Amino acid sequence: MATFESSLKPKLIYVFRINDAAHSGALKIGEATAELGDGYFTPNSPLLKQAAHQRIDQYTKTAGISYQLLYTEGTMFKDAKGCISSFNDKQVHLVLERSGVKKKDFGKKNQGTEWFMTDLPTVKRAIVAVQEGRQPPIGREISPKQETIVFRP
């Protein structure tokens, strides 16, 4: 009897930093695949951390770059209607950008596009905003700066 193996693998979001001058104040928000599990993970579970380390090591280990993994979270969740949903790192990036969080400028075109000048609590709030289906900008939750509204006649 033939067996079926799904090609769909659970995804996760990871956040890490590199403690050097070039990356000062910046966090990388990326996405990886978890090879095990059903997709429902608690944030920072050992399985998520392992998958994140495997992914990050792919592009840091050979260069001898040390990093600090700060946070991991599975991308599958139940939405407000109880339906299974998923999100990706690009959606988190969009919330951050539209909320006024700046990307890290490394001085080269198309380099470091997933690095943001932010802190971990802000990234976590952006993830929640994506899960709740809130459209950016999410204002005061992300940035303490309040823009003036100009009404047109």
List where the protein language model places each region:
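Non-catalytic accessory segments flanking enzymatic or RNA/DNA-binding domains
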Residues: M1-P153
